[in-house]
Amino acid sequence: EFTTVGIAEKVYFANEKVIQIYLQSVETTKTSEVQLKSFATYLNMNDVEVSFKPSTLFDHHLFAVGTTNSGKSTSALSILDKLIEENKKILIIDPTGEYRDSFSEQEVKKLNLGVDTIVSPSKLSMQQWSVLFEMNSNTQGAVLAEAIKSLRYQHKNGENCCLEKVGKNIAQLQKDLSSIQNDDNDFDISLLPEQIAAESVEEARKGGVYDYSIFRANSNSYLVQKVSYQLSNTNFLDFFKYDPQKKNLLDEVKTFIHTPNASLYINSSELGASEGIGGMIIDLICNCLISQDEIIPFVFFIDEVHRYTKSPYSEEEFHDGLVLLAREGRKKGIFLFLTSQNPQDVSPILLGQMGTLLIHRLTHDDEIRTVKNHLDEYSVKQVKKLNCGEAILTSVNLINNIYLNITKCKRKQYNDTPLL
């Protein structure tokens, strides 16, 4: 942290008492909180243990970033360990399953997405369905909405097949469909491609009934293929389905945020890394959280967040749920704790909301340039040289950047690198 002194310059050696006074003055947070237990030691300061108030780390959100094998996951677990010991509420999203045995059942409630927990179709808005299936025109979105409405009607009446409209009286069918109530939202997603094809109808010239439309069938064919591909070539149906025997993800999240001293762990390792489903589920959770009132404050931890930020359909687009939470969540007591290998994998808007960064080794100039505004000139030069487990903590709540050596906690973590 200190540059080499010049010849004939005065040098002062700080004893342990002076070091402690300096370290206690680094935090600018004036709250009366009790500091968390030490999760690291200071580099170049006789391995003095570091302790911070929770608000110093989280009140402007925390982002841990570093290349693979730089120690960021170990750092994250060390911080989570101290939060759990202090009975702080945590919501954990684990995309790889490496934290699945880190916490006991008494400490956190564990859910396995796609195994014992699903997302009921009733929890998705039409806009979210449109994004998920990459609707590229208003026409496609309207057809999808009509198909979903028809399947909701079928599910309400206990029918396990699509709604055939050809030959049906238009006025009567519209009356039947209007009987759907706000709580009649569940439907069988596996029937969606077939129902979209069944929406290829138009008003017959006589009789006031629906007739098959070749023009609409041709127009809808691409949408049918797209939805069929998503359902048959991904694990989509493992997560989005109506199954009263399994836990509903959003219901579990709502219960968690209103339960004191409770933590929730969600294992999302069954999600495909590049199928877009993960980003949509995170969006759902974020929108669910931001819509709730009287939330008991908690830390929302998402490991490897780059899996959930970028849209799979465009390199320039990002899911906006996390951005919304970063902007508005703090007012409701929701504090983000994110990890990623590359700071460029999150949107610039989201990165701009991160007031505290735990920076591990970064090697690419573009990556370093992204976090350059958070570092002084000396720190920028040191980022490439950090060893595994070493990090620079920079925050709006600290007077100076601090160099840390993270202390590995004793909790089990599946992140060891296999020997070649």
Where are these regions (language model features)?
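Conserved ATP-driven motor cores of ASCE-family P-loop NTPases powering translocation/secretion/packaging/pilus
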Residues: 133-135, 324-402
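Interdomain "pre-motor" coupling segment immediately N-terminal to P-loop NTPase/helicase cores
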Residues: 1-30
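Short loop/turn elements that form and flank the Walker-type P-loop nucleotide-binding site
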Residues: 57-59, 85-87, 259-261, 293-296, ...
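P-loop NTPase motor domains
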Residues: 97, 101-103, 107, 121-324, ...
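Conserved nucleotide-binding/hydrolysis micro-motifs of P-loop NTPases
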Residues: 96-100, 270-273, 306-307, 342-345, ...
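Conserved P-loop NTPase motor module
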Residues: 178-179, 195, 389-420
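Glycine-rich phosphate-binding loop of nucleotide-binding enzymes
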Residues: 35-115, 348, 393
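Hydrophobic residues in beta-strands of the RecA-like P-loop NTPase core, especially within AAA+ ATPase
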Residues: 93, 302, 339-340
